[in-house]
C-alpha cells in the first residue's frame, strides 16, 4: 500500500509507547524510532502535518527510490527522516566508529551516503537528513548493523563527520541500454 501525505495527518507523542507518532488517518499509525529523551520540547504538543512536511516527504521519497529496501522499509525511512528533521534534539558526531577518507564531502539532505566501519571495514548505507559544514545527521538506510557492539536498526539516527561520508553509488539505479 502506498501512503500519500494529506492535511489529516497529525504528529503527536505517545507516552505509552514512548515514541513520536504520526497519525496517518484511516486508522493507520506510524511509530517512529525516537523516544522522549531524543526529542525537542516541540514534540510534546500535537501538530498537523504541514506543507513543509509534505514537501520533505516527497523529496525524501524520491531520493530513497534507489535504496535496496522494500516499499515498506522505504516508507519507514522517509517518515523517520521527517521526525528527525522536525523533532530530534541535536546530536554529537560519533565518527570514531568509521574510517576517515581525508576528503571533505558536504552532502545535501536526502543524499544516499555510505561509511565504512573502522573495526570490520563493513560498508554502512545511510540517508542524509541534515547537512552541516563539518558533519551530517544521517539515518541508517539498511535493515540493521552492529556498531561497537550496539545494534542499530533501519531509521536509527547517527551524526557523522563529513570526512567519513562518501556518496553512495547504486548500480541498480543505472539504466544500461544494449549496444547493437
Swiss-Prot record:
Tell me the compartments it is located in: Cytoplasm
Q: Name one Pfam family in it.
A: ZapC_C
Query: Does the UniProt entry include the keyword Transferase?
Result: no
The answer to whether the entry has keyword Thylakoid is no
Checking InterPro entries in the record gives: ZapC, ZapC_C, ZapC_N
Q: Name one GO biological process term.
A: FtsZ-dependent cytokinesis
Keywords carried by this UniProt record: Cell cycle, Cell division, Cytoplasm, Septation
- Give the UniProt entry's GO cellular component terms: cytoplasm
The source's domain of life comes to Bacteria
Q: How does it assemble?
A: Interacts directly with FtsZ.
Q: What does this protein do?
A: Contributes to the efficiency of the cell division process by stabilizing the polymeric form of the cell division protein FtsZ. Acts by promoting interactions between FtsZ protofilaments and suppressing the GTPase activity of FtsZ.
| UniProt family annotation | Belongs to the ZapC family.
Against HAMAP family, the record matches this protein to: ZapC
Q: In its UniProt entry, what is this protein called?
A: Cell division protein ZapC
Biological source species: Shigella dysenteriae serotype 1 (strain Sd197)
Lineage here is: Bacteria, Pseudomonadati, Pseudomonadota, Gammaproteobacteria, Enterobacterales
